[in-house]
């Protein structure tokens, strides 16, 4: 049985929404990973060594999609090459130690009032002057534009299946899914609000990028399946912080 199938069975047995059970599971795993970093000697040494490294490329909340040449951070042990870390608020690296950081389809899963500002400020701390932060998120503005226009071709371009899924049968259901994804997503982003978040974290040079291209070439290792409906934004840390 799949994880979602088990959660559905547990939800029905307990009378608790699946979204609540998934959130509880994440918090339990995060607590375990934090304790592991203190109590497991191998994990403690791994994190200590990481804090001594410089000129890093960081792949934040990678899931099972690890990248060669990157330090891959992930809460769950999807792959032997990940360093386990709760990436929602901070990064386990030294100040100014990274020349590039990429965050693909993770920011929308974070609380926009608490976690997003903290993580972006910590990315700024971790980047060397001139370092680049690349963020990839669902482009909710495109979903909204397609909805307002009732433009089936625009939804097709966003890789929405035809006919619509059985559990998302209408135009507005598709838009809701882009924002919430069954409560896995916490916030929606367009260029304007993502720029505001980045400016608030200290970044001043914020630009829209494209799939597969970056000011730091390795950061452009974007996942193909996200390309049709993603927004790509890059921000640069100032060369000299006042």
Model feature map: region roles:
Residues 6, 54-57, 84, 201-204:
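Aromatic-residue hotspot detector
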Residues 50-52, 64, 225:
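Short, flexible hinge/linker loops that cap or flank conserved catalytic cores
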Residues 55-143, 192, 233-239:
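Conserved SAM-binding loop
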Residues 1-53:
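Membrane-proximal basic amphipathic "stem/tether" segments
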Residues 49, 74, 90, 223-224:
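Short secondary-structure boundary/capping segments
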Residues 1, 241-242:
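C-terminal end-of-chain micro-motif
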Residues 114-123, 128, 132-241:
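S-adenosyl-L-methionine-dependent methyltransferase catalytic module, highlighting the catalytic core
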